[in-house]
From Swiss-Prot:
Coiled coil: none annotated. Keywords: Amino-acid biosynthesis, Aromatic amino acid biosynthesis, Isomerase, Tryptophan biosynthesis. One of its GO terms (molecular function) is phosphoribosylanthranilate isomerase activity. It comes from the Bacteria. Belongs to the TrpF family. The keyword Chaperone does not apply. Gene3D superfamilies: Aldolase class I (3.20.20.70). InterPro entries: Aldolase_TIM, PRAI_dom, RibuloseP-bd_barrel, TrpF_fam. It holds the Pfam family PRAI. Pathway: Amino-acid biosynthesis; L-tryptophan biosynthesis; L-tryptophan from chorismate: step 3/5. This is N-(5'-phosphoribosyl)anthranilate isomerase. It catalyses: N-(5-phospho-beta-D-ribosyl)anthranilate = 1-(2-carboxyphenylamino)-1-deoxy-D-ribulose 5-phosphate. The keyword Isomerase applies.
Amino acid sequence: MSTIVKICGLTTADTLEAAVEAGADMVGFVFFPASPRHLDIDFADALGRQVRSRAAKVALTVDADDDLLDAIVEQLRPNWLQFHGSESPERVRSIKRIYGLPVMKAIAVAGPDDLSVLPDYAAVADRILFDARPPKDATRPGGLGAAFDWKLLDGVNLKLPFLVSGGINAGNVAEALRVTRAQGVDVSSGVETSPGEKDPDLIRDFIRAARAA
């Protein structure tokens, strides 16, 4: 299976087109007001229509309530839901049942103890995303450009695909994939010139490097 490449936090038509044309498998739209990549649903819908069927549309939320999820699913019609908050395994199972959509659950990693929740989430999610645990004073759970110790994933043996994120860019994506043996990578800040400002050239460089890894 080829490496799954996800570009997350896209906010403009130009950067979305760069990601899709370069061969991204998944494109992520963020629905979390504290993030500089936050989109309102109407604009996300316009970007989603631009994607057509060229990549999977991923709706990223953080502890979203049912009303927000209803609106996102009805208007954007995403292919995937990504949960980046403290959603419980029971919540993941319930939402999958309600919407009939696959779910990718992010697990924040700083040390080995953070992996203790993995079996419970692996039993209900369709993909797992390992991301760096943010500082306690952070206002958002991801997209901070911080990496975790990839060697912590030594011995992780999942029956479902998993992706890695956090501090990954074109210069280190090959090493991230080699060390973690992940089936995919998810990048946001690693293809930006400033928070929320994606760069088409950095997107293309990242996808090229991930494919060559």
